[in-house]
Amino acid sequence: MPQRQPQPAHPADGIYFGLMSGTSMDGVDGVAVRFEAGRAPVVLAEAFVGFAQSLRDALFALQQPGDNEIDRESLAANALVARYAVCCHELQRTAGLSRDEIRAIGVHGQTVRHRPERGYTRQLNNPALLAELTQVDVIADFRSRDVAAGGHGAPLAPAFHATVFGAPGETRVVCNLGGISNITILPGGDGDVRGFDCGPANALIDAWATRHLGKPYDDGGKFAARGTVQASLLDALLDEPYFTAPPPKSTGRDLFNPAWLDARLAAFPQVAPEDVQATLTALTAVSVAREIAQHAPGCKAVFVCGGGARNPVLLDALRHALREAGVPASVDTTAALGVPPQQVEALAFAWLAYRFTARQPGNLATVTGAAGNRVLGALYPR
């Protein structure tokens, strides 16, 4: 008699891909991960596929209103998804998987508008095309359901952070330093998980490096290290009302973009470029530290993920800002918890695809401000 194959602990268990291209818009991070109910996720493969400068230019242009947007957006979405498909094929090859072994691909898309106060958020994507190119089920459009329920649609990672990084008896903060900074507060006991966007991170740091170095980012924070923080400029930047707005809140390039920076720099024409870079690095650190001091003063450990985790000058600035704010917390990357920082965001969207397949909520209403927890996403069958 043939042996029966062991059944998964939960019908949704299996291998999922997660794809995330964030506000830095330099490329897409992907992971292949196995989820089993009651067990820690197991990463089988990771990949990064960069974007050509022509695609980056198209994505940056769509951040601001312009002419012929529908045509430009659709063409950019198709080009974007072509890179997503390359990432999926690389994950499949590295992990040695057949298409039939992959339950679904969870893909975020590329945010080009985020205006929950007007009832919408727009992620550039073509999930139907991705399903066709990969012949795998695709789950996308995760943020819209939360916005429809009155939430900000962001951040969505805190529910995943709580599952993977929480520890009983210890208040932790997970800090994502992508284009925008956000934090997740894990209370370690009674109390709600909280999370929100703090302000700009690599969005402005990278833009300034591109303008003055001709490079896509400040490698290792070396440009900032050559400069000195200008206190008066930092105060002017921190005068932005978003920094003192109460959560739930979310932001993006709609607000924190080069035009926002230039408007404030107009009053400081004498500040050298390297000093501006040092001050932008301090802006990220101080805005995060102040939010932690206000909302998690007992935090003992901050774990950083996102591109900023590779910037030692930014991490040192965060340590200094936390000390100045009276928060006695250590600062490390999520690698200390067993998850490389470059994997965290893609892992979160693989997890959201897993939650969708199980028809379980993916948001935390206490984080986003939605009317309740909701199943997030939409299915595009292969």
Swiss-Prot record:
Pathway: Amino-sugar metabolism; 1,6-anhydro-N-acetylmuramate degradation; Cell wall biogenesis; peptidoglycan recycling. ATP binds at residues 22-29. It comes from the Bacteria. It is an enzyme of class 2 (transferase). It catalyses: 1,6-anhydro-N-acetyl-beta-muramate + ATP + H2O = N-acetyl-D-muramate 6-phosphate + ADP + H(+). InterPro entries: Anhydro_N_Ac-Mur_kinase, ATPase_NBD. Its EC number is 2.7.1.170. GO terms for biological process: 1,6-anhydro-N-acetyl-beta-muramic acid catabolic process; amino sugar metabolic process; peptidoglycan turnover. One of its GO terms (molecular function) is phosphotransferase activity, alcohol group as acceptor. Keywords: ATP-binding, Carbohydrate metabolism, Kinase, Nucleotide-binding, Transferase. Gene3D superfamilies: 3.30.420.40. Belongs to the anhydro-N-acetylmuramic acid kinase family. Catalyzes the specific phosphorylation of 1,6-anhydro-N-acetylmuramic acid (anhMurNAc) with the simultaneous cleavage of the 1,6-anhydro ring, generating MurNAc-6-P. Is required for the utilization of anhMurNAc either imported from the medium or derived from its own cell wall murein, and thus plays a role in cell wall recycling. PANTHER family: ANHYDRO-N-ACETYLMURAMIC ACID KINASE (PTHR30605:SF0). This is Anhydro-N-acetylmuramic acid kinase.
